[in-house]
């Protein structure tokens, strides 16, 4: 399959990730604990994967840092899904295409075109509407702040992966999941949560199983695609998560989604779409060489 198709599949799976997060929360793994359990399972499985392949665990420094930042973004995103409305969290995470465009222009030497200005303006305008509702006052809770930080970490990580040289997906998954676990441990420490938690120990085991069967495949698809697609292109393809995440959140959780939220969502999607209007950017890597 092509990188575009695999990135789209990853987006659909990311869009449904709130379901296991909320399910584990119901079992007693609140805050960052659900993400920590799943990422721990993904790390154990990816490390075993590398051992079986006997792959050298020495990726280029830039690729390793990029994978680690994606891991930070994964943990921030999982915590955001537990602390905020799924619809708002998913939409605010998708300021990532705007951050990606700025990073490409400032650090990767790609040109700034009129669609870039449209992407940035539409994304920021959409975020203001989603946060403020009536566009007169910004209201950002912990979930929204974590979602914004997650999108920024993702954008920087994707840019570093794209420009850091080719590395096997298994090795990158080790760095991504290990970083996600480390970030989750920081959250747990800040929250003063006992580790491992006494009551939901079985839930931790179930979370680790979900990490092996769900998170690891999605991470592998994501980091593999990130090395082959320009950051803004990848972020655009992953906006399929908006459709999946928002629709599933509205239909299954009955979360509020009024006219202002709909307009904000449309602006964010427009910002992502505008980046690919002039044509495919799969060959953007050539501009960096």
Please provide the spans of the model-predicted regions.
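Loop-to-transmembrane-helix transition segments
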Residues: 2-10, 50-76, 120, 142-150, ...
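Helix-helix packing/entry segments at the starts of transmembrane helices
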Residues: 5, 37, 90-95, 161-179, ...
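Transmembrane alpha-helical segments that form core, pore/gating elements
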Residues: 7, 11-23, 46, 100-101, ...
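Hydrophobic/small/kink-forming positions within alpha-helical transmembrane segments
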Residues: 15, 19, 47, 67, ...
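Hydrophobic/aromatic residues within transmembrane alpha-helices
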Residues: 24, 34, 80, 92, ...
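Membrane-interface helix-cap regions at the ends of transmembrane helices
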Residues: 42-59, 72, 124-138, 179-205, ...
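C-terminal transmembrane-helix exit sites in multi-pass transporters
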Residues: 50-51, 79, 96-118, 243-262
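Hydrophobic transmembrane alpha-helices of multi-pass small-molecule transport proteins
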Residues: 115-133, 260-278
């Amino acid at each position: 399959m092509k990188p575009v198709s695999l990135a789209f599949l990853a987006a659909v799976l990311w869009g449904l990730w709130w379901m296991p997060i909320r399910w584990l929360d119901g079992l007693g793994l609140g805050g960052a604990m659900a993400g920590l359990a799943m990422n721990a399972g993904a790390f154990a499985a990816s490390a075993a994967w590398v051992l079986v392949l006997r792959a050298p665990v020495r990726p280029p420094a830039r690729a390793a840092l990029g994978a680690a930042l994606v891991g930070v973004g994964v943990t921030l995103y999982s915590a955001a899904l537990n602390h905020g409305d799924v619809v708002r969290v998913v939409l605010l995470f998708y300021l990532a295409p705007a951050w990606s465009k700025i990073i490409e222009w400032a650090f990767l030497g790609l040109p700034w075109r009129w669609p870039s200005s449209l992407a940035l303006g539409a994304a920021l305008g959409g975020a203001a509407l989603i946060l403020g509702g009536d566009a007169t006052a910004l209201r950002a809770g912990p979930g929204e702040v974590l979602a914004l930080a997650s999108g920024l970490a993702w954008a920087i990580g994707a840019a570093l992966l794209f420009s850091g040289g080719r590395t096997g997906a298994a090795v990158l998954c080790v760095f991504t999941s290990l970083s996600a676990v480390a970030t989750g441990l920081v959250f747990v420490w800040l929250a003063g949560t006992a580790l491992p938690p006494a009551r939901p120990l079985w839930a931790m085991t179930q979370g680790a199983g979900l990490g092996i069967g769900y998170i690891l495949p999605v991470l592998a698809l994501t980091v593999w695609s990130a090395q082959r697609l320009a950051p803004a292109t990848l972020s655009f393809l992953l906006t399929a998560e908006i459709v999946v995440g928002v629709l599933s959140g509205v239909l299954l959780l009955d979360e509020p989604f009024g006219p202002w939220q709909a307009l904000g969502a449309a602006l964010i999607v427009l910002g992502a779409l505008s980046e690919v209007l002039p044509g495919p950017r799969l060959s953007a890597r050539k501009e960096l060489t």
